[in-house]
């Protein structure tokens, strides 16, 4: 596990303790019991791929630990509308406050402004956060394999699916991928960013794609910047993408999405 991830997880443990003191787990469990159905995150991804189109998870992200503030003029609802118009299949919204300047409110604002399913992009390590995601209105959660033991991975993914949430498991190397595919989740994300060096290489996805079972949707994450990057992936059978920073630096995120993925079809 990288030093930055250790730091984030230590902070996350404190945050969970603070939140559960304010809103007890039992209250979240009760509130999660009578909610509308989710929008179907994995189904939306699969529908785009079945139609022969790229399935794009477009990210709503203000800042990151490595880059600082990426988008100072940050309005999640407007970004969500722009992404939907640009052809996104789903959204990803950062909710981590301390390291990414995210917010639960950003997820709710983005989701209310559009009809797309939404991933809560956070560091989920505790059942409390799974119930919290469902109550917030998320349609999918992220589980980062390098942050979890095998039993945690199984328990958290099982709870999420029991609550009607889809799960995207994120891996960085082949050892993590072998662990990830042991849990029956629909979406496997390969992050092309090395957590130790922060260097990005699309070869990471290409080297690992054959080890992803055919019944899972393989999502390539980080480093998709040009139309040739998209074409490289699609020509190798990778049709699902999570893209954030490239769009967040553009004046019109949805137009940047359309230009990257759909202007060359």
Swiss-Prot record:
Pathway the protein contributes to: Amino-acid biosynthesis; L-tryptophan biosynthesis; L-tryptophan from chorismate: step 4/5
Enzyme Commission numbers on file: 4.1.1.48
NCBIfam families, sorted: PRK00278.1-2, PRK00278.1-6, PRK00278.2-4
Transmembrane segments: none
Protein name per the record: Indole-3-glycerol phosphate synthase
Amino-acid biosynthesis keyword on record: yes
Catalytic activity: 1-(2-carboxyphenylamino)-1-deoxy-D-ribulose 5-phosphate + H(+) = (1S,2R)-1-C-(indol-3-yl)glycerol 3-phosphate + CO2 + H2O
InterPro entries per UniProt: Aldolase_TIM, Indole-3-glycerol_P_synth, Indole-3-glycerol_P_synth_dom, Indole-3-GlycerolPSynthase_CS, RibuloseP-bd_barrel
Entry similarity comment: Belongs to the TrpC family.
Any Pfam family the entry gives: IGPS
Gene Ontology molecular function, alphabetical: indole-3-glycerol-phosphate synthase activity; phosphoribosylanthranilate isomerase activity
The entry's keywords: Amino-acid biosynthesis, Aromatic amino acid biosynthesis, Decarboxylase, Lyase, Tryptophan biosynthesis
Gene3D superfamilies referenced in this protein's UniProt entry, alphabetically: Aldolase class I (3.20.20.70)
Classification of source organism: Bacteria, Pseudomonadati, Pseudomonadota, Gammaproteobacteria, Lysobacterales
Gene Ontology biological process terms in this record: L-tryptophan biosynthetic process
Enzyme class, spelled out: lyase
The organism's place on the tree of life at top rank: Bacteria
Organism: Xanthomonas campestris pv. campestris (strain ATCC 33913 / DSM 3586 / NCPPB 528 / LMG 568 / P 25)
């Amino acid at each position: 596990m990288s030093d930055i991830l250790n730091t984030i997880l230590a902070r996350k443990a404190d945050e969970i303790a603070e939140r559960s003191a304010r809103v007890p787990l039992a209250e979240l469990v009760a509130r999660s019991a009578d909610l509308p159905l989710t929008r179907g995150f994995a189904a939306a991804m699969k529908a785009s791929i079945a139609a022969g189109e790229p399935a794009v998870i477009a990210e709503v992200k203000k800042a990151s630990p490595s880059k600082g503030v990426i988008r100072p003029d940050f309005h999640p609802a407007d970004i969500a509308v722009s992404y939907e118009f640009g052809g996104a299949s789903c959204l990803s919204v950062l909710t981590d406050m301390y390291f990414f300047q995210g917010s639960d409110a950003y997820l709710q604002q983005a989701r209310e402004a559009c009809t797309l399913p939404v991933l809560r992009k956070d560091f989920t390590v505790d059942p409390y956060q799974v119930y919290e995601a469902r109550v917030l209105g998320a349609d999918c959660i992220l589980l980062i394999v390098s942050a979890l033991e095998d039993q945690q991975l199984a328990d958290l993914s099982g709870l999420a699916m029991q609550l009607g949430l889809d799960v995207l498991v994120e891996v960085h190397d082949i050892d993590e991928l072998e662990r990830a595919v042991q849990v029956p989740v629909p979406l496997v994300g390969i992050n092309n960013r090395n957590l130790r060096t922060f260097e990005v290489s699309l070869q990471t996805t290409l080297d690992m794609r054959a080890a992803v079972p055919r019944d899972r949707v393989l999502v390539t994450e980080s480093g998709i910047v040009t139309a040739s990057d998209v074409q490289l992936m699609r020509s190798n059978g990778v049709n699902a993408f999570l893209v954030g920073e490239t769009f967040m630096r553009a004046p019109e995120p949805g137009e940047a999405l359309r230009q990257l993925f759909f202007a060359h079809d």
